[in-house]
Each structure stands twice: as C-alpha cells, then as structure tokens.
Amino acid sequence: MGQIITFFQEVPHIIEEVMNIVLITLSLLAILKGVYNVMTCGLIGLISFLLLCGKSCSLIYKDTYNFSSIELDLSHLNMTLPMSCSRNNSHHYVFFNGSGLEMTFTNDSLLNHKFCNLSDAHKKNLYDHALMGIVTTFHLSIPNFNQYEAMACDFNGGNISIQYNLSHNDRTDAMNHCGTVANGVLDAFYRFHWGRNITYIAQLPNGDGTGRWTFCYATSYKYLVIQNISWADHCQMSRPTPIGFASILSQRIRSIYISRRLMSTFTWSLSDSSGTENPGGYCLTRWMLFAADLKCFGNTAIAKCNLNHDEEFCDMLRLIDFNKQALKTFKSEVNHGLQLITKAINALINDQLIMKNHLRDLMGIPYCNYSKFWYLNDTRTGRVSLPKCWMISNGTYLNETHFSDEIEQEADNMITEMLRKEYQERQGKTPLGLVDLFIFSTSFYSITVFLHLIKIPTHRHIVGQGCPKPHRLNSRAICSCGAYKQPGLPTKWKR
C-alpha cells in the first residue's frame, strides 16, 4: 500500500519525463489491447454460441451490418448458354432450348464402322446446328487430334451419334497412349469438370522442343458415346449449370478465384510481411469485414533498440518491426495476382461464361445454394461485400487495386516519435512502480495474444458447405429458424 501511495505522489514528476510517458502509453495500450484480445479471441463467442446455438439467429451482425441476399435466376441463361448436369459418373447431359445431348462412358460399342462423314451431313442439313456447335466445341478442345480412325459418327435421320474409342485402363496404358486422341478426349472431358471417373496419371514432355507437357489420363471405360436426346428430367438430383468453352479451355484456368474470409469487425493478429499468420512475425494485421490493413514498421527501430535499450522495451518494440522491402515484394505479388484474376474474369465474361463452381469461388461470401447468395450490407455507409468484379468501372469488370505509401509513412512517423534521443538519457529516471506496471501490462498482453494463437472455435459449420452465420447450428446441424432443417449432417467447429 505504501508503494502505491508513493507512486501516486510522484505522478507529477513522472509525467515530466518523456521516457515515462512512453512507458505509461505502452502500458495503457497493452492493457487495452489485452482486454480487446480477451473480447475477440473467441472465448466469449464460444460461450455465447453454446448458450444460443439452435435457439436463435439474427439478420443483424455487429449491430450495423445487415445480412441481405441476392437470388440469381439461371434458367434464362439456357437461351444463350448450354446447361449441363451429371446423373452419375458415366452419364452426363447438356441441354439447349428443349433439346440435349447425352455423353455416356460405356464398355459397349454403338457404331461398328470407323469413319465420320461430317461434310456430307452438313450439306444435307441432317443435324441440329446448335447441338452440333456444342459437339464441335468439345471436339476442337481435344489436343493433337490426328487419328480419325479413333472416332466414328452417324447422322442418319437427323440423329447425332458420335463415338470415341478409349483404351486407357491402367497406368501403363495411359503412359503408352499419352499422345493419342483417346488421351486427348479424356483431357478435354477432364477440363469440362466432368472427369469424376477419369484419373490423372502423370505428365510427359511433348518432345517437339517447345517445352510443353502432355497430361496422361486413365479410365475404366472403352468408349465415349455422344447422342442427341429429347430433354427430360435427367438430373433431378443435380442442379443444371451453365458450361463454358473458349478461354476456360484454352487457358486452362481452373483454380483462379478471389477469396475473402468473413472475420471480426476489427481483429488484430501477428503475421509475417506477406500477411500470413505467424506467431513469430513482427507485423500487426488488422482484419475488417471488407478489407485488411497491414501495419508494420522499419528495421531501424530494432537496430537502435538492440544498441541502447533494455530487453523489456525491445520485446515490445519487436512486435511492430517490419522490413519495407518485404512489403514491396508483397505488394508486387498481390498486384500480379490481381492482374491474373482480372484477365481470367474478363475472359469469362467476354465468352459469356458463368460456371457454377467458379461463380461460387468468385463470390467468396456465405451462400445457401448455387443461385442464392448472401452478402453484408453496411447500414451506415451503404457498402456491400459483393465482389468488385460485378461492378463495371472504366469499361472493365474488375477494379484494380493500387497500393499507397501510407503504411511506409506511418511506420516512419511511429519510429521517429518513439525513438528520440532523450529516451536514452532519461531512461534511468523511470520509477520502479511504473516499470512494474509496464511488465504487468505486457505480460497480460502476451497472455491474450496466446489466446488468439490457439484459435478458439466460435461456431459450427456443415462439412463441405459455407459459413452458416448468422444461423447458429446445434450438434444435429439444424437451426430453429428453419434455414437449416436437415438433421444428422456432419459438422465441424470453425473460428
């Protein structure tokens, strides 16, 4: 008690010293940040979730963000785009304005001859040109097609019947026939996202001196048969989705997407210079609902700290150390990635491509199904979390992000303010009680950082589906509001 009274008696003299002001400031910041970490580490969220799961859910998130939804009617796309679906691993369907094609993997041959008189069928106008356009696009996507005896076709009576011979049963066959038309058919089928019964084996150099590679595939079926059919409910258990050609096939863009995670309104975490979470990093990453800021500071602080300051002060200062060169590399990598994504999205839109899986990835937000998407609407500012590629600006479909120098300027200002020469001269005038307060606050802050690092889960997800917020699922994977009403689905905990 005497030390506390003495400490408060010396307060007027304490605040006269710059170093003491710094310690007081850092202590208050550490305490406030520690309290904030306790509030946001997930522990309170986990407790509230366990108390409310399965009982209530709200469309208001963080008091200001409203959950809204946009529903896309994909049925009208069938007027301009062919739709596709799969009944099982061997039967796939494409339909266009009431008529369709059936693509079947089978071991039974339909055509016994080995020729395809496409020119004669074209002169006699024997087939549906819209459906034949789909077949032609698929055929032209087959790499290195130079073995016409490997396919057969028949257009008698206006019926489309095309058969591709396949011969890849195991790994050895796939390697031996890697450059044949059969492998090309499997390659094209695989890139159409219909390859659940096709196995990727290996890749071999082309041997033409171009440095390109040929991908080898295997399947247990002997033939691929394409026939026109009258459309019926062939895919009752599968939602038909648009299929695309051209750029998505030639560029083989299959995994480029924009990813945004829904995080707390203001969540700070330790990371490395690229923004990746790293307990040993010297960067503070502030995550918001719509963006993430990287707050890092220069190596000069650490150099001067190691030369003239004690260990406690340095440990705190190292938390805000940053290498500017690493930030420049990070910015260039992000800009390169954005340019690549811009190219992919523009190619998709220019070719009238809206593929189900890619659309889901591009949204990067909670969703209920493939046609209804949820997004956040800020009731104060009007900002929404819909992807920028949906907003047309300057004739493009994706706004390019240009980084400013605010991070570097803020780093320099912080270093200049914290590392003044007067600190070295007046460091010895710091009272012991203030040092104890500083040590306590930094220890409290370190403990709360550990709570963040263990990543306490806060809610349940259904395995294989998106974030169910604001719905709170119970152990049976259901919510009382009726949005999730299929019990027994596997769940997992998420932060």
Swiss-Prot record:
Covalent S-S links between cysteines: C85-C235, C116-C153, C178-C216, C283-C296, C305-C314, C368-C389
Keywords: Disulfide bond, Fusion of virus membrane with host endosomal membrane, Fusion of virus membrane with host membrane, Glycoprotein, Host cell membrane, Host endoplasmic reticulum, Host Golgi apparatus, Host membrane, Host-virus interaction, Lipoprotein, Membrane, Metal-binding, Myristate, Transmembrane, Transmembrane helix, Viral attachment to host cell, Viral envelope protein, Viral penetration into host cytoplasm, Virion, Virus endocytosis by host, Virus entry into host cell, Zinc
Glycan-carrying positions: N78, N88, N107, N117, N165, N228, N369, N377, N394, N399
Binding site for Zn(2+) 1: C57, H471, C479, C481
Record site: Important for GP-C-mediated membrane fusion: K33
Protein residues bound to Zn(2+) 2: H459, H461, C467
Topological domains, Cytoplasmic: 34-58, 458-495
Lipid linkage positions (N-myristoyl glycine): G2
Residues spanning the membrane: 18-33, 437-457
Any GO CC annotation of this UniProt entry: viral envelope
Intervals, Extracellular compartment: 2-17, 59-436
Swiss-Prot/TrEMBL GO biological process terms: fusion of virus membrane with host endosome membrane; receptor-mediated endocytosis of virus by host cell; virion attachment to host cell
Top-rank lineage group of the source organism: Viruses
Pfam families the UniProt entry points to: Arena_glycoprot
Molecular function GO labels: metal ion binding
Feature type site, description Cleavage: S58, L59, M263, S264
Position of the signal peptide: none
InterPro entries, alphabetized: Arena_glycoprot, Arena_glycoprot_zinc-bd
Sequence similarity: Belongs to the arenaviridae GPC protein family.
Protein name: Pre-glycoprotein polyprotein GP complex
Lineage: Viruses, Riboviria, Orthornavirae, Negarnaviricota, Polyploviricotina
